[in-house]
């Protein structure tokens, strides 16, 4: 029996929500370990659509325990709004089935404002953030001035913490010629949040260790994708946290040895939101068609996603940086009907062939994809639930992807419905 980490193997939006929901049926606990409410995902269950951003996918299964780990940055108001929306849809959410790490960093209104100010200050310096305060909150965490959930349990300690926080933020506000934040107002807001949030507070590392020793199955749910990792992604066009699989340990307080299987999620093509390099991007009618078929718009922001062919170089790189054991390939059905399909198998950089994406921003912008053409298929793959339901050429495409990225396909998704999944290897039994 293995505890399983699920990570995006591209730039996010790979369909992690559906796969995590599908796997959560076999898990006892589902844990978020990084990011915030900037990465939304949609789940379709029995015809009902649910949109999640901050909450783990496990909340949709009442018998499971969901956990938000210390690696997450936590927006109190966004949390309460999301809980209310799901409760209105009939989803039961309470401290009985949801716990939040007591040492999680809080996102405050000042973080959201700073995020927006920076992003909108100049198009030349914009990196495409969601303006939800994620980056500034992580900055305060690393700068050792963040307000954490546990601080709400002892309100008397908050004033000096707020003063320390504002010593930094009000200096920035003055630089923007904006009025300073009022410490009293922030204290008032945090005081109001305390009774609503503290019932969920938990010493998460201890809770998970106890559950692990009891033999419970733990599913670690990543947000965004490995190519947005602050260290290993396309810097500076990345998120502000580590999104690779190793963060599952750091972001929950579990040791690395507790992770038994890493499942990477990737689309049968590639998408990206916002700025940054994208070697296989299609700016033609084919790219538009993939976007229309795949409904490639952000769950939270509604932003249109850039679309391109499958990039085996990038996914192979992610397989290495995340230690991925198996891949879940999603949205294969979007490629139905194309006469031919291109797959990137390498790059040319300044006249030389390379087998990875360089770390430098300048070099990243100069790489040119080397494509291999694969014959398409006319028969539909949508809603397939076994290999026998797939066209022969679609199976050849999947097998070629496996060869190029050096990793087996463990799951194949053919629609947003959780039942439309072909299982090759069960990650919990690997």
Curated annotation (Swiss-Prot):
Annotated binding of substrate, by residue: 299-305
EC number: 6.3.4.4
Binding site for GTP: 12-18, 40-42, 305, 331-333, 413-415
Family of the protein in this entry: Belongs to the adenylosuccinate synthetase family.
Gene designation per UniProt: purA
Residues that bind Mg(2+): 13, 40
Name of the protein: Adenylosuccinate synthetase
Complex and partners: Homodimer.
Catalytic reactions of this protein: IMP + L-aspartate + GTP = N(6)-(1,2-dicarboxyethyl)-AMP + GDP + phosphate + 2 H(+)
Listed PROSITE patterns: ADENYLOSUCCIN_SYN_1 (PS01266), ADENYLOSUCCIN_SYN_2 (PS00513)
Cofactor notes: Binds 1 Mg(2+) ion per subunit.
Pathway: Purine metabolism; AMP biosynthesis via de novo pathway; AMP from IMP: step 1/2
């Amino acid at each position: 029996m293995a505890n399983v980490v699920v990570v995006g193997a591209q730039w996010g939006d790979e369909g992690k929500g559906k796969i995590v929901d599908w796997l959560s049926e076999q898990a006892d606990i589902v844990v978020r370990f990084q990011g915030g409410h900037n990465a939304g995902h949609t789940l379709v269950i029995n015809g009902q659509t649910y949109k999640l951003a901050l909450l783990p996918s496990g909340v949709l299964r009442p018998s499971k325990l969901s956990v938000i780990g210390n690696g997450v940055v936590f927006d109190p108001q966004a949390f309460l709004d999301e809980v209310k929306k799901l409760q209105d849809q009939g989803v039961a959410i309470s401290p009985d089935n949801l716990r939040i790490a007591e040492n999680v960093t809080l996102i405050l209104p000042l973080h959201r404002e700073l995020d927006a100010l920076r992003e909108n200050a100049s198009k030349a310096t914009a990196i495409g953030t969601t303006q939800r305060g994620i980056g500034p909150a992580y900055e305060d965490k690393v700068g050792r001035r963040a307000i954490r959930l546990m601080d709400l349990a002892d309100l008397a300690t908050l004033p000096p913490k707020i003063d320390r926080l504002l010593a930094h933020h009000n200096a920035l506000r003055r630089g923007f010629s904006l009025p300073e934040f009022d410490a009293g107002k922030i204290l008032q807001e945090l005081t109001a949040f305390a009774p609503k949030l503290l019932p969920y507070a938990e010493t998460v590392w201890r809770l998970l260790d106890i559950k692990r020793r009891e033999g419970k199955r733990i599913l670690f749910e990543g947000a965004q994708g490995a190519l947005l990792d602050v260290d290993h992604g396309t810097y500076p066009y990345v998120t502000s946290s580590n999104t690779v699989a190793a963060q599952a340990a750091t972001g929950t307080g579990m040791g690395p040895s507790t992770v038994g299987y890493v499942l990477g999620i990737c689309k049968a093509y590639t998408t990206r939101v916002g700025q940054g390099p994208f070697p296989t991007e299609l700016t033609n009618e084919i790219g538009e068609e993939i976007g229309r078929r795949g409904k490639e718009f952000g769950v939270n922001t509604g932003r249109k996603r850039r679309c391109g062919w499958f990039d085996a170089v990038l996914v192979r790189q992610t397989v290495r940086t995340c230690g991925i054991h198996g891949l879940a390939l999603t949205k294969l059905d979007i490629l139905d009907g194309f006469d031919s399909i291109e797959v990137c198998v390498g790059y040319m950089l300044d006249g030389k062939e390379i087998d990875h994406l360089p770390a430098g921003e300048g070099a990243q912008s100069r790489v040119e994809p080397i494509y291999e053409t694969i014959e398409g298929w006319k028969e539909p793959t949508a809603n397939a639930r076994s290999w026998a339901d797939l066209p022969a050429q679609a199976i050849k495409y999947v097998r070629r992807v496996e060869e190029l990225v050096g990793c087996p396909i463990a799951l194949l998704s053919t629609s947003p419905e959780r039942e439309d999944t072909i299982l090759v290897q069960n990650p919990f039994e690997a």
